[in-house]
């Protein structure tokens, strides 16, 4: 771990001033707790003025991540999403470390190794770090050389991680809240994303409180509303115009049809009402008249009987299309027992009706 940054440009902050900290990766929860406690106590002592003590200024950013975990964009993004700060949060920025808001001529110095370039504002420092020190690294390995950083000289393969990480050193907070008169700004988009819903949750909680008060004041009105809701619920329960034959059901039926064709090894035509049979020659004979006959065998198997045809008719008899109603009933059940299931049930039902009538 490198020594703390001792930049010549920024003045020394009070000992009670809050130090900039970033939520550390997994495995450094104790550092995070220490940073949070020092930040809360420091924000309370800041109002007492510079008499609270002083010391050498240093930028200590608690972000130590091993190479195996820093290389994961998702883990780094989730870690950085916890880094949120507002204008009034008490986190130290280069402006605060150079003497607070009372000094108008603030100086922001780059604490990168072998670089002490001063700047008048934190956005300029952030642009300098991004263009010179971050984008200038090539080769697939990216390292933070900011003096005093807890991940100093720790390699990473994520270029975007290093870009987001350097925002904690520059003090730049480019993500600003646009809700109402809120002046909060954040160093990461994740912090802004978590901050914005807090405005609406406060509004919703106030609305719910007012709504509960109105119910308590007028219980009879609440009872009427409950009855109306029950009536509407009953009406909806009576008729539900939903079509359950959706795309998923159609896919399931199509899948069963494909499985049926594969198991039965058949082809169908006319919306599945006709079966296509294919013939193969299994025997050949020559009659006394000199004509040559061929014995054709039909597939699917055991549905149609083998037949002798003239050799000249072989081309026409390669395939035969037979309607399901024309198939022999004793052998058609070999295709699938469901083919005549409805008709058999219908005949059974008609027979029972006749018995009752007689």
Swiss-Prot record:
Comp. bias intervals (Polar residues): 75-92, 199-211
GO cellular component labels: ESC/E(Z) complex
Biased composition (Low complexity): 1-26, 39-49
Example GO molecular function: zinc ion binding
Family: Belongs to the AEBP2/jing C2H2-type zinc-finger family.
Record's function text: DNA-binding transcriptional repressor. May interact with and stimulate the activity of histone methyltransferase complexes.
Protein name: Zinc finger protein aebp2
């Amino acid at each position: 771990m490198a020594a703390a940054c001792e930049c010549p440009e920024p003045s020394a902050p009070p000992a009670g001033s809050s130090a900039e900290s970033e939520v550390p990766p997994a495995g450094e929860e104790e550092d995070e707790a220490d940073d949070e406690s020092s930040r809360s106590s420091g924000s309370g002592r800041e109002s007492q003025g510079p008499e609270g003590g002083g010391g050498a200024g240093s930028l200590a950013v608690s972000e130590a991540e091993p190479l195996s975990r820093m290389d994961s964009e998702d883990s780094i993004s989730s870690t950085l999403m916890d880094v949120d700060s507002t204008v009034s949060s008490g986190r130290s920025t280069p402006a605060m470390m150079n003497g607070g808001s009372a000094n108008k001529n603030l100086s922001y110095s780059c604490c990168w190794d072998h670089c002490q370039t001063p700047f008048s504002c934190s956005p300029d420092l952030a642009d300098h770090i991004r263009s010179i020190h971050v984008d200038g690294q090539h080769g697939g390995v990216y390292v933070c050389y900011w003096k005093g950083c807890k991940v100093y000289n720790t390699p990473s393969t994520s270029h975007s991680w290093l870009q987001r990480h350097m925002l904690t050193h520059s003090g730049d907070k480019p993500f600003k809240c646009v809700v109402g008169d809120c002046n909060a700004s954040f160093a990461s988009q994740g912090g802004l994303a978590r901050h914005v819903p807090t405005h609406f949750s406060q509004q919703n909680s106030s609305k719910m409180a007012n709504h509960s008060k109105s119910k308590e004041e007028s219980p009879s009105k609440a009872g009427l509303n409950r009855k109306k809701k029950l009536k509407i619920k009953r009406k909806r329960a009576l008729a539900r115009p939903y079509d359950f034959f959706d795309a998923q059901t159609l896919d399931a039926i199509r899948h069963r049809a494909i499985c049926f064709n594969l198991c039965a090894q058949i082809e169908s035509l006319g919306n599945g009402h006709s079966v296509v049979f294919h013939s193969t020659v299994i025997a050949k004979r020559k009659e006394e008249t000199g004509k040559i006959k061929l014995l054709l065998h039909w597939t699917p198997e055991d549905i149609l009987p083998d037949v002798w045809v003239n050799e000249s008719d072989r081309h026409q008899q390669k395939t035969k299309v037979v309607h399901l109603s024309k198939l022999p009933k004793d052998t058609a059940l070999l295709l699938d027992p469901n083919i005549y299931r409805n008709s058999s049930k219908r005949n059974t039902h008609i027979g029972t009706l006749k018995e009752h009538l007689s």
